[in-house]
Amino acid sequence: MSWRDSGNPEGGGAERYLQKMATGLVALGCRVTVFTVKYAGAPTDEVIDGVRYVRAGSKLSVYPLAAWNLLRRRFGRVDVVVDIQNGLPFFTPLGTRRPIVVLVHHVHREQWQVVYPGRGGRIGWWVESRLAPWLYRGRQYVAVSRATRAELRELGVTGPRVAVVHNGTEPVVSVETRKTAHPSICVVGRLVPHKQVEHAIDATRALLPEFPELRLRIVGSGWWEDDLRAYAPDLVARGVVVFEGHVSEQRKQQIYEESWVMALPSLKEGWGLVVGEAAAHRTPTVAYRSAGGTQESIVDGVSGLLVDTEHEFATALGDLLRDDERREVLAKGALKHSYGFTWEHSQAAFARVLSEAVQGRLIDDQDAADAADAIPAG
């Protein structure tokens, strides 16, 4: 159960994780169905890479529809349900008695009031922080980082039942390009308020006097794009800030390869999938320590830089643009760190969690995988 799939225009790293875990399970011989929201141009029922996608409902109605369809057994025989909670749960315990595994990328404590100021945000946070831990008491959880696991513990998800399965890193896509001759920064991700792309724009403006040829390329789309364009119309008009939009995988890899450094000003990241993607192209990242998962996807001072304030964010970007030697050291460190996370290992670890859940066992391991034993025969 997922609020989006990887084909959704608003999809991001969480949906890439879903896609990878689903195809990994199919490769092990599992039958996988993903129930998600319907969006323009997408079939209501299709199979991609062996994974069945069933789409229905709207941004909010998809949640009760999940439990209803489970209750009516519209997905056929189900052995285990993965309830992906991106803030809101799918209430799957109301629709099935089968084992349920709850997947959480990060806790949305700060984001609720950013996206839904006032009562809406307070209700959303109550559902996530109070109702969901009670509804899924005793269920198996999967967190994508130790930081997320710690946040879940604070919400009362206690006991040896929160496994950690990290994101992987994509194999490097060969692109015929090299780092730009002029200083360049990229931001990659959904354009929504909590990604705080404004911080990267502000940093670019502050650094322009020293680096007049500096360019900031913003890759991705989202409902906040118009607000971002209006935030710095002069920089957009001068071509200093370039909105690339939703690009092909090849184009994204090209931008990673060309950029001197990636800025990740996000308020919250369960892991930061783009960190590994950029690292594979020897592009280090500057991010906020408080984002959570960045403390694991980035080794501070080795594969990138972690900062605490917006001023430090701009300063760190400037330091890396200015210091070729330090940037090269971090580039090598980023590439080396990215080798430590593969999708194949993550897929096997995730499959093991599901296998244990089917057999009624809870686990609390980190990236523990035995692909050969992940899915029991039959």
Model-derived features: positions:
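Short hydrophobic beta-strand element within catalytic cores of glycosyltransferases
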Residues: 284-288
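Conserved acidic donor-binding segment of nucleotide-sugar-dependent glycosyltransferases
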Residues: 300-311, 319-325
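Conserved donor-binding/catalytic core segment of Leloir-type glycosyltransferases
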Residues: 142, 173-205, 217
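Short alpha-helical donor nucleotide-sugar binding micro-motif in glycosyltransferases
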Residues: 246-247, 254-259
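Nucleotide-activated donor-binding/catalytic signature segment of Leloir-type glycosyltransferases, i.e.
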Residues: 229-247
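Aromatic "clamp/platform" in nucleotide-sugar-dependent glycosyltransferases that forms part
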Residues: 267
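Membrane-proximal helix-turn-helix segments that form the acceptor-binding/catalytic region
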Residues: 120-141
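Carbohydrate-associated surface elements
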Residues: 147, 168
